[in-house]
Amino acid sequence: MRFIIRTVMLIALVWIGLLLSGYGVLIGSKENAAGLGLQCTYLTARGTSTVQYLHTKSGFLGITDCPLLRKSNIVVDNG
């Protein structure tokens, strides 16, 4: 029972941290537009957001993989 309570408290603290910082964590990605585009899905405290990036395998033009963290446009506390 103690483990469950600690796990729930840890999840709540992470959620509050995401809410106040405005960051999102990568939960999924897929290639689109004949391999030239990369669609990344992020979990934020306010829901999910989807971002499109230019994608190349070499990374010379665009990015190779989605960033693990991404700053959201909507932040609760700008203080």
From Swiss-Prot:
<feature type="signal peptide">
    <location>
        <begin position="1"/>
        <end position="33"/>
    </location>
</feature>
<dbReference type="Pfam" id="PF13996">
    <property type="entry name" value="YobH"/>
</dbReference>
<dbReference type="InterPro" id="IPR025611">
    <property type="entry name" value="YobH"/>
</dbReference>
<protein>
    <recommendedName>
        <fullName>Uncharacterized protein YobH</fullName>
    </recommendedName>
</protein>
<keyword id="KW-0732">Signal</keyword>
